[in-house]
Amino acid sequence: MNWISNVVPPKIRSFLRRDTPENLWIKCPESGELVFHKDLEANLFVIPGSGYHMYIAPKPRLDALFDEGVYETIPTPEVPLDPLKFRDVKRYTDRIKEYRQKTGAPDAVKLAYGKLQGLDAVVAVQDFAFLGGSLGMAAGEAVITGMQQALERQAPFIIFTASGGARMQEGMFSLMQMPRTTLMVQALREARLPYIVVLTHPTTGGVSASYAMLGDIQVAEPGAVIGFAGARVIEQTIHEHLPEGFQRAEYLQAHGMVDMVVRRHDLPAVLARLCAFLTNSPRRAPIPA
């Protein structure tokens, strides 16, 4: 070993080193297919070969949903950040700050208002990347605000659900959001305004036990896991094996819990068609087969 071997290789490695973005290639959890990240983004985060629907953030979802990607963001109310002064391995306030920095959002629900094939609609999107899309005071207030906006604008309300359930760090304050949101669903019904739920992967826990399963029309993305408790918990409780595909969107459709399973690319046309039908508006594009 001499100075040449000590100095030259590091120099060469330094020269050849380049800043390479992580996750250039995304692997399909179902088929193992590798997809270039830009191609996956252009395909709305649906794996081309297998059709597997991966996580999609609220912004690209809304961009693809509304006419020409044009919509108005509806601000969500501020709520007390940490009413219980909760702490586990870290303080709850620190967790919130971490996820706000990670997602660029104040909490797990984003609201927007725009046109679906010319029809007004208020849309809420739950972001599973923000603390598992969990339902706390902020998320509950956001959902309620979206429904209130639909009432004020006399427009259909559409919500894309994705959640692991109630936010444990907020205790009873989190559980209170279940009846509060359910009451607002009833207000939409009394006003004869369409309430359409799009169940995305996963929709579980307290969200599935409240507003997520109360839609006039229940739509689901392919392969989405939908249920209250997890499959393993159910099996351990009843001491029986569950049917294949249990809690998947297609299974729920076959058993009457979901009205239709719709591919992500087809959702704008399908939702516009449903809104037109439920509001007696002029018919637009047909629902894709």
UniProtKB/Swiss-Prot annotation:
Keyword Nucleotide-binding: yes
EC number: 2.1.3.15
GO cellular component: acetate CoA-transferase complex
GO biological process: fatty acid biosynthetic process; malonyl-CoA biosynthetic process
Keyword Metal-binding: no
Top-level lineage group: Bacteria
Pathway of action: Lipid metabolism; malonyl-CoA biosynthesis; malonyl-CoA from acetyl-CoA: step 1/1
Keywords noted in UniProt: ATP-binding, Cytoplasm, Fatty acid biosynthesis, Fatty acid metabolism, Lipid biosynthesis, Lipid metabolism, Nucleotide-binding, Transferase
Every CoA carboxyltransferase N-terminal domain range: 24-289
InterPro entries listed in its UniProt record: AcCoA_carboxyl_beta (IPR034733), Acetyl_CoA_COase_Trfase_b_su (IPR000438), ClpP/crotonase-like_dom_sf (IPR029045), COA_CT_N (IPR011762)
Compartmental location: Cytoplasm
Functional note: Component of the acetyl coenzyme A carboxylase (ACC) complex. Biotin carboxylase (BC) catalyzes the carboxylation of biotin on its carrier protein (BCCP) and then the CO(2) group is transferred by the transcarboxylase to acetyl-CoA to form malonyl-CoA.
Database matches in PANTHER family: ACETYL-COENZYME A CARBOXYLASE CARBOXYL TRANSFERASE SUBUNIT BETA, CHLOROPLASTIC
Name recorded for this polypeptide: Acetyl-coenzyme A carboxylase carboxyl transferase subunit beta
